[in-house]
Amino acid sequence: MDEIKVGNIFAAVFEKSVLDPLLAILDRGSVKFWGTEGTMKYVKVKGYSGKSVVTSFDFDGRVKSLDRAIFARILADRTKKSHVLGLEELARFTPGVKSGRNLESTPGVSSVPFDLVIVGLYAPDKKNFPESMDIGGQALIRAAIKNYKNVALAFDAESIKELVEHLNANQGRTLLNFRKNQAQGAAKFIAKRTAMEAEFFS
């Protein structure tokens, strides 16, 4: 799939302000956000629709974004009918949206694959390592890398800047070559991050 119109976005960023350049150009009426609670609070303040997607098992924040409903919407191949039907089936039985203090199912809504994934990792702290490893964020990035043919990815301030320029030049759509380049950049980013974490064991 070459062109993908950005309408459904998953966002989970540690430094919320990195989203500002993107939020400044998107059409509030045609874009919906899903993501972690803090990020969704931020995009709502900016006037966008946002739903906090959480897992039923949080474990002090260790697995808050490690949920099959989230990863299915990132990894689904929208050109395959079996994947589309699988998302619809998953949506009927997955409690995945935080509403107040309760989890509620989201039939129909969460069956839509994500068009764009934006992740901003928090910096690892050597003094508090490996507890300070960002597991969920790296997993989200790797999922989007794998499925770049179906979903765009931004993973730091520079890649968000490039995304904004690309969307402006292509009427809010991402092209396959751009998604591939972003995925390659993300793979290099994750490789550097992993190498740094490996050094922390020394």
Model region roles, listed by residue range:
Residues K98, N102-E104:
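Intrinsically disordered, low-complexity polyampholyte segments enriched for Lys and acidic residues
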Residues M1-S52, S56:
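N-terminal glycine-/serine-/threonine-rich phosphate-binding loop
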Residues K41-F93, N102, V109-N128, I135:
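Acidic/Gly/His-enriched mid-domain segments of enzyme catalytic cores or analogous surface patches
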Residues E165-N168, G172-S202:
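Long, charged alpha-helical interface segments
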Residues V112, L116-K127, I135-L175:
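A short, charged helix-loop
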Residues A11, K32-E37, K51-T55, A76, ...:
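General beta-strand structural signal in soluble alpha/beta enzymes
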Residues I4-N8, R28-V31, K46-S49, R68-F71, ...:
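Short coil/turn connectors at secondary-structure junctions
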